[in-house]
């Protein structure tokens, strides 16, 4: 595991440099991505994310925020030294994680509210996403997908391959097509790998897409390392998967640096045995303040504490930024702590 630099920091200002007219003239998503998806290896394929430029969003145009620049509670890219970042975005009672390295950027889930998501992306200067990975169809993970249309340019949307034609996911496919300006959603399966600069996202499970419910959530292993070199840091992204779903992968995954806790820290999100094997230094929970579900539960917080994890929650900390380097993982939170 990489050493952890957990000194949370504030950044006083987010400056937005480009005018609203720029986004009208953005080019279409890179064709190389479509070519890369055209050939599938027998057990494993790599989906190369070539990297759109992550240009600053224009606050007045996209989010309607006034007086954002200079706010002491906002975290800007660069508040951690590395360009390689995984950011648990504060989207209320939902999940959205931004993975970026230089010009490459991928979003894992979107949360529910398009306005909230766009504000979160604006805080980090993101106007283009090479891909959006949807763990499952629930509105708190996929509800904001269609809201990206015409605002944030999206190269690809990926769901489980079994859901590309499934009746249960007609609305999800429609939202994806809207975000993709009429293009189609694409399928992934265990063994597929999405690359984001020096990051790789390997799909571990499930084998079957099911009905795209919580238990059918896509579980991704996020790894960071120098290209062609050894893995320097690892994280497990579980969607709304809980103990039963984590049980299918945790022994193969082994020691990780951070865990994106499943199902917003629900009662059965993770157990002591899984924590003993995974040993995450950080546990990230996407959760809304004062939610009606009691998330995160005291039971799960106790499991995480016994497992030695530092718990960071979007309801308390806002956006949680992990900055990766060959030496350490630096942690920055929007609200401090």
What are these regions (language model features)?
Residues 1-337:
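Non-globular, low-confidence helical/coil segments that flank catalytic cores
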